[in-house]
């Protein structure tokens, strides 16, 4: 734990997990050929001034490229968040994270924490070694949100925009403002250190406390796979998963998310296989692969839909549902 400022009534704790924001390349003009997770979170805070009345502290939770994010890191991160959120002098948390799976981690934390204080994930599209890194400004903005008196819930801050964990998606491979909230739009903007709120902060999930307890106690997390519906899609991958399950494999599939076209439509061959999987006890959920919009339910649908959740977020929701079912059974 590195304390950056000592004299204050309220603290913002920055938890580091790696990512591009802590990446380093061999040349300052190289924004893509870097190694993620090279710079410690305490070093990222050098030169970052705390807002008035706030002390900064840093804790390294993990140091990975976020493409390699794991359930084990998620569990540890959730536990460290819960620890700090219980501290009475904590104003809020900031988590530095890679952009690739940031939306998954944000959604997971929103589902298992019930924060009455802000938990702010931030990131960078350029490594720390870049000529003009975007990480320092994103970190300043994230700290401003974490210190905002009325802020709460799990949010993402990137390029001056604040997104809800439920709606945020990475929508660009390279641009600095790589995230978007689709139809819902952003929650707020950060302008010269001031937070301009546009809509309500995220509400806590009533099931979060129970979900947290279950993931903390779980020896294994349910296996949930994502399969894409597309032209000439087939059910062979579903059949492979079912055959592995029938043989009593060490980690049998328990859930399948279908990344569906349009308003939740699925190729007939893939749908037939998914219905067979459902009949054999596998939980199946449809989520639209469209960047915006939600699935509007239609009568007679035999496969559940995930509403406005993206396939990767639907996977997390289904995993937590399966954990709850196992606990109840």
Question: Where on the chain are the PLM-derived regions?
Answer:
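Accessory alpha-helical/coil subdomains and C-terminal extensions
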Residues: 2-11, 15-19, 25, 40-49, ...
